[in-house]
Amino acid sequence: IFLSAVAVHAVESIPGVTSHYQTVELGDGSRLQAIVAYPDDTSAPLQPLVFTQWVSCGSLEYREGSNAREVLAALARDSGLALVRVERDALDGTGPTCAELDYDTELEHYVQAFARLFDDPRIDASRVFVYGSSLGSTTAPLVAHELEKLGFAIGGVMVQGGGGVTYLERMLNFERNYLERRPESVAAAAIPDEMLLRTRFQYEYLVAGRHPDDIAGDGPEMARIRADILGMGESDQYGRPYAWHQQAARHNFLAAWAAIDAPVLVIFNEFDQYEIRHGHKLIVDTVNRARPGTATFVERPNIGHSDNRFATLEDAYAGREGTPTWQETAVILTRWLNEQT
């Protein structure tokens, strides 16, 4: 169901690109704003490139100077596909805001919204491409697999900044990087015991589904860990409800990757502050075992999670003096898409 195509704030302006705003209504009554962007000179429907975004909330509209949004703008302009984005905040109180949204509902909203947007006359849904960035790398294979089950042919899936390990492993990698990459604050000899404590906390939180405050009540060590978990606030982690992360921990990302019948591109940035190489390579190895030669692995030296180049791993973790490399990322993604189309 498409409603009035009116933006409630400034419409994005990408040179050489037309951005069409519309509202899509979902089965639970939520109304989400969507943006379909394509080159100005487009005269025929284009196959869609749907985007699944990172964990943090915020609009997906183009904003000059944001590495991630510059990449999206380049894809809209140069990929030969229609870039399809869906904002996660429900409009006018019709559903949850992004900060209230849990993982399973976010996933369902993506699938429903994209499927309905494929009826747009600007879109040729004969093949669908999916791009996931950061934690969107976990929703990307799940969305692609669900769209396949609805009968849509997946032309390719691209991810950067997220691997195929379990969510528990992912968050433990966050913790290990947090300890290892701050040598001025954490002694190497203290890391093994600290990781055991953090593993206990993360298991209770993500797998057992306990509230962080309840875990903190188990004793002073757990209380100390609770106060020092990355991104964890009084009622959220990285701006999302605890339930978002606990539901993510119940999903089998690797099974989705193995099931998708499509080419796959995985980009790993060597100095990623959160993710590790193994998780990215695991996707490629799993897909290539199931469908030999269909998955591509690209490793980019000296680059961090958010597409900046740094001199050292420690500089990357501290965010010191990074140089944007989004143009390089856009070229890698666009070339790969052109090879598939």
Predicted regions and their residues:
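N-terminal cap/lid segment of alpha/beta-hydrolase-fold proteins
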Residues: 11-43
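Short, surface-exposed "cap/lid" segments of acyl-processing enzymes
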Residues: 41-75
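Conserved alpha/beta-hydrolase
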Residues: 72-93
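Alpha/beta-hydrolase active-site loop
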Residues: 100-120
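Accessory cap/linker subdomain of secreted extracellular hydrolases
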Residues: 160-259
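Short beta-strand/loop motif that positions the catalytic acidic residue
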Residues: 260, 266-268
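Conserved alpha/beta-hydrolase "acid-adjacent" motif
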Residues: 273-281
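Catalytic active-site module of serine/aspartate enzymes centered on a nucleophile-bearing elbow/loop
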Residues: 303-306, 311-341
